[in-house]
Amino acid sequence: MPARLDARATRRYFDNAFNSPAVKILPNEYYVTNGEDVMLSTVLGSCVAACIHDPVIGVGGMNHFMLPEGDIHSPASATMRYGAFAMEVLINELLKAGAVRERLEAKVFGGGAVLSAMQLMNIGERNGQFVLNYLKTEGIPVRAQDLGDVHARRINYFPRDGRVMVRKMAPHHQKAEALIAQREAAAAQTVQAETRAAPRVERFDTPSRRDPVGA
């Protein structure tokens, strides 16, 4: 499945705290390095980020997805919003960059229930369970994970050597809360819209009242 070019993160900056060039990964984006020494950074609420790299050649990448899976019959499911698509894109782009599938290692983060609405829909929990199941199916070992809880997280990932630094953000961090609330509301609206749009399937548990054929 080809990657969406508009989903590749483009927001570059220099992080003074880490003295490193960096790329900011927003929701529904991904980034794969070509061996350059760069830090990938994102902020997570109920969303999940998978950090995957090939330790032999130092190529790695990160994605940031909001929901586990969409309706496979809907074109909307083929977007970086959904984990199933975001994971496939990330792995395919790593292989294109020279990574070897058998050497890939993963670290996964996020899936927090940072807002009450997210707790009711279990979006964070579902995202976390999805990414673990996906990686298990693909045979990619998970070397570290920090999933669940009620905190937002800032992730700083160094793909060249696989290091990840996680900072759990205070529950009342106003700037973070405002940003995450906006993203979480969008995710919740998507879930609700998909639930309303789900086709109804009629069940035929009782014998039909039609006249027998040939009557």
From Swiss-Prot:
Gene3D superfamilies: 3.30.1330.200. The keyword Hydrolase applies. Pfam families: CheD. The keyword Protein transport does not apply. Keywords: Chemotaxis, Hydrolase. GO terms for molecular function: protein-glutamine glutaminase activity. This is Probable chemoreceptor glutamine deamidase CheD.
